[in-house]
Regions:
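Substrate/ligand-engaging "lid" and interaction regions
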Residues: 1-277
Length: 277
């Protein structure tokens, strides 16, 4: 699809707005065993003009250890094999930061946009842990660990996003077919992930990011992003997750299951449930 995605905005009255999203310029497989693409990623990270990288990999993507406190086998493999054979997300990022370090130690902002509390802190801890383990085995220098430990050099801004983006809906795919848009069928991967050439999402949205970018940044405000300090990000996240939004959504989900509803949207047509909210 030439890196194009069809954005389908779901509106309260059941209608949709459609827009082609053309902001993706390049798609690269972030795996060290794919030599050409791995070298391309190294080239990108070595560029001193790179200002930020961002993630949406779910909270599980930052986890290094299981409930028993030991490293997952795939993480232990990354630790034992070093940067040139990185496989997991955290190892890949740490390896690429090492490439940036070797190319001149240019600053960079490493931004998690996953919806979990203190996401920047979680990301930083995981990257630092990987670097420290590699340092023990002689794969990376003491100076590299110092480089990514210094937030004046490599920052890990906190963020909070409120954007409901369900998995690709069959009803949306059907409506696109009826409108003459071809090849929109969702695909289910071997890991039960639903992907499609379109993204369906609700219209209401906001993204709040801690303004800590040591190498400068794009004018994210122009895209509607709220730039602020860490304390404000934390307060906004706490408001959403524990006070105003998520608890209400969870309550509706529980009552909806009891009353036989399949969709929150259908629940909102129920007068008593809408008054509960």
């Amino acid at each position: 699809y030439d890196n194009l995605v069809l954005g389908v905005t779901l509106k309260a009255d059941g209608s949709t707005d459609k827009k082609v999203i053309a902001s993706l310029t390049e798609a690269i497989k972030a795996q060290s065993n794919v030599e050409a693409e791995w070298n391309r990623l190294k080239e990108i990270f070595q560029n001193k003009d790179l200002q930020m990288i961002s993630f949406t990999i779910t909270e599980k993507g930052y986890a290094l250890k299981g409930a028993d406190g030991t490293y997952f086998p795939f993480i232990q493999s990354d630790i034992d094999n070093g940067p040139e054979k990185a496989g997991s997300a955290m190892a890949v990022v740490c390896a690429l930061l090492h490439e940036r370090f070797k190319a001149g130690k240019a600053p960079l902002a490493v931004v998690s946009m996953d919806n979990c509390s203190h996401n920047g802190e979680k990301l930083r801890n995981s990257i630092l842990t990987m670097a420290e383990e590699w340092n023990k085995k002689g794969f990376v220098e003491d100076e590299f660990v110092a480089y990514i430990s210094d937030e004046a050099q490599v920052s890990f801004p906190w963020s909070m996003i409120d954007k409901i983006t369900p998995r690709p809906a069959d009803t949306v795919a059907e409506s696109l077919k009826e409108a003459g848009v071809e090849d929109m069928d969702p695909v289910i991967t071997s890991k039960r992930t639903y992907i499609a050439p379109f993204v369906n999402a609700e219209g209401p949205q906001y993204l709040v990011i801690e303004d800590r970018f040591p190498n400068g940044r794009p004018q994210l405000e122009k895209a509607g992003v709220y730039m602020t300090d860490r304390d404000t990000v934390n307060k906004v996240e706490r408001m959403k997750v524990t006070t105003c939004l998520n608890p209400l959504h969870t309550a509706l989900a529980v009552y909806g299951c009891v009353l036989g509803y399949d969709l929150i949207a259908d629940e909102m047509k129920d007068k008593e449930l809408s008054e509960l909210e």
